[in-house]
């Protein structure tokens, strides 16, 4: 591979305040002497990771590029902003993003009758994984995905098992 593409949360970025100056995709790109494009952003969630990855690959040459995706927490909920929040951080894009955390909004969520917080998060996470995996497979883009933050897929729900085992 000549190029490495990386996307995720802060665990795929340097974090100098924490004394962390390297990250997985940086180490791999240096080891392989490959160009690195990194769209990872601290505190962001999986919707942004999936969508911005597909936008980048549609705007750039897919050939000779290996994708590394470090999934964020399924309890980080991204939304597109209309205020230009941190505009310009990702070249060639107009969208800007913010994130709210499920566990910071439990009072609101509990007011919604029957909202199953954990199963909702698991469903969204599985959907993000399979959506991006399908995109990579369809476009013949080699990739690896892993949980940069913990996510619970050990749920015995028939619907989830159907998707996980497909």
Region annotations inferred by a language model:
Residues 1-52, 58-60:
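Serine-esterase "nucleophile elbow" of acetyl-processing enzymes
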Residues 54-166:
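Alpha-helical cap/lid subdomain in secreted, periplasmic
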């Amino acid at each position: 591979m000549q190029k490495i593409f990386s996307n995720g949360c802060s665990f795929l970025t340097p974090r100098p305040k924490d004394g962390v100056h390297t990250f997985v995709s940086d180490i791999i790109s240096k080891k392989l002497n490959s160009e690195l494009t990194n769209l990872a952003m601290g505190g962001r969630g999986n919707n942004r990771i999936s969508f911005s990855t597909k936008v980048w690959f549609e705007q750039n040459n897919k050939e000779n590029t290996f994708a590394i995706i470090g999934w964020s927490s399924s309890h980080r909920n991204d939304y597109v902003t209309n205020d230009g929040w941190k505009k310009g951080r990702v070249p060639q894009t107009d969208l800007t993003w913010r994130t709210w955390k499920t566990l910071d909004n439990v009072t609101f969520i509990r007011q919604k009758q029957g909202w199953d917080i954990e199963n909702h998060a698991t469903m969204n996470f599985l959907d993000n994984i399979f959506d991006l995996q399908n995109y990579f497979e369809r476009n013949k883009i080699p990739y690896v995905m892993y949980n940069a933050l913990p996510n619970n897929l050990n749920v015995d729900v028939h619907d989830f098992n159907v998707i996980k085992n497909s």
